[in-house]
A protein has these predicted regions:
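Generic structural signal for short, solvent-exposed loop/turn connectors between secondary structure elements
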Residues: 1-11, 61-66, 80-84, 144
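N-terminal ordered "arm"
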Residues: 1-58
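Hydrophobic/aromatic-rich structural module bridging two neighboring secondary-structure elements via a short loop
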Residues: 43-87
């Protein structure tokens, strides 16, 4: 049984995991433990768009690299439980980004990110059928 004890950041993680499971009921979540002065965990979730999303919370995971069902994580977060569920490590699609060594290349203003999110939401509604949006739309470049 994997666990995630969160001391700060649960509402943001709950929102992210809720969105991920809303897009894909079989989404997975993976924990990457960090120790930057205080214990923290990056929680990554899969999406149906060939990308992952993440949120950092203060706290500790039972095991670095543990993978659980995102739906189990969401239920645990909503119930305020630390115990998340059984490990599902083989479900994770690949390697995680490195823990450090990133270089800031550019910053996107919040207004631009908000506008892109609104347009994305409109497109998601437009293609809300069982086929979803065309792959070419999902693979298009949005920011350069």
């Amino acid at each position: 049984m994997e666990s995630l004890r969160i001391t700060d950041g649960a509402p943001g993680l709950t929102a992210l995991v809720g969105r991920a499971t809303g897009l894909d009921a079989s989404a997975s979540a993976r924990f990457q433990s960090l120790d930057a002065g205080a214990p923290a965990v990056d929680v990554y979730v899969t999406t149906p768009f060939d990308c992952i999303a993440s949120r950092r919370v203060s706290g500790e995971a039972s095991r670095d690299g543990a993978v659980v069902a995102a739906s189990d994580l969401l239920a645990a977060l909503q119930a305020g439980r630390a115990e998340v569920g059984a490990a599902r490590d083989p479900n994770w699609p690949g390697a995680l980004p490195p823990r450090e060594g990133f270089t800031v290349r550019d910053e996107v203003p919040v207004s631009v990110a908000r506008q892109l999110a609104d347009k994305g939401r409109e497109l998601a509604r437009q293609f809300s059928g069982p086929m979803g949006p065309p792959k070419s739309l999902l693979d298009s470049t949005v920011l350069t």
